[in-house]
Amino acid sequence: MVDGMKHLILKVTNRCNLNCIYCYANNKNNKDMDFKTAKNAIDYLLNLDNQIKIQFTGGEPLLNFNLIEKIVDYCNDNYSNCNIQYAIQTNATLINEKIAEKIKELDIKVGISIDGLEINDILRPYKNGKPSTLDTLKGMYILKSYNIPFGITTVVTNKNLPYLEEFVKYLIAFGVKSISFDLLKPKKKEHLTLMPNIEEFNKLLNKLGRYPIYIKNLQKRPKDKYCYLNSGDLLFVNEFGDIYLCPTLEGLSCLGNINDKNKIKLPKVKSKGCYAREFLIKTFKK
């Protein structure tokens, strides 16, 4: 076991309504996580640490929002003595007033995935090819109307890099306080053609440093703080209960299944940067 596990990512569904051109997830099935699997993961983690963050992801996690509600209720009923924070990473296209009210009631922190304005329609279209950006922006406006703060996560590729400065200006005008830049992690060999120019990205970061917004990016983090994986503080469980050190490594290096705890083996991994990104680039360049 890894001591001090603090961050549990639950892939509550593999279903998604978008078709991102660089998708990290394997969307070959439409399976939802069941409550038993989620419960086993939570029980396992809370045996290691009573202060944890549970993040709901997918797919698009709002497609299985009933499970999210059930998980929070379970934790409130059974772990009221623990410090548990909740977060969701969503494309925001499904957010309506009912969901916004429930998110606020359950005190779930929100992260929204969007890669720009017009360019987002190319990078993150719907399954049928139609644009998704306006629906994401609509979800953002609904959250804002309910005074629900949210951060933005943007995957940086060579397609959207030229437009990111204007996008940041838009977010500032909208009232967004923080944005995370996540350099593309190539899940397939063809994704290597989308890799951004790191020198140009660093130039952009230097320019954005004068803007009134908190910019989080993996490039500038201390090496031992690059991600939860490097400190042994991350557990990712997919819809089947399979365990990985990082969502990006799903399907590549399974460490067991949460429903068979006797066979779980979690090594400690140290990396100079993003272990998953390094691993994938080396793999696909062979």
Curated annotation (Swiss-Prot):
PROSITE patterns assigned to the protein according to its UniProt record, in alphabetical order: RADICAL_SAM (PS51918)
Single GO MF annotation: metal ion binding
CC cofactor: [4Fe-4S] cluster
Radical SAM core domain boundaries: 2-221
Residues that bind [4Fe-4S] cluster: 16, 20, 23
CDD domains on file: Radical_SAM
Similarity field: Belongs to the radical SAM superfamily. Anaerobic sulfatase-maturating enzyme family.
Protein name per UniProt: Uncharacterized protein MJ0907
Organism of provenance: Methanocaldococcus jannaschii (strain ATCC 43067 / DSM 2661 / JAL-1 / JCM 10045 / NBRC 100440) (Methanococcus jannaschii)
